[in-house]
Amino acid sequence: MPEFIRVNYETDRRVFLNGEELGRTNETLNSGAGPFRVDMGVPLTYEPSFRRVNPSGTSSDKPLEVDFTAKSAAP
């Protein structure tokens, strides 16, 4: 069954599910059934370094939202 995720981040980045490139940030992506390890590859300028998700009951207009934020600069 199709499932959908949207990885939210402040800039355009590649999105990886279980190490395989799926698409780009800030777009609705057809992920299929999970569970998945979601990350944005290197450089690791974001946090957390990954998220574990298991999309269920999603649609293209109501994807599972997965949020990442930019790492704070070291003082």
Regions found by a protein language model. Name each.
Residues M1-P75:
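Short loop/turn and low-complexity linker motifs enriched in small/turn-promoting residues
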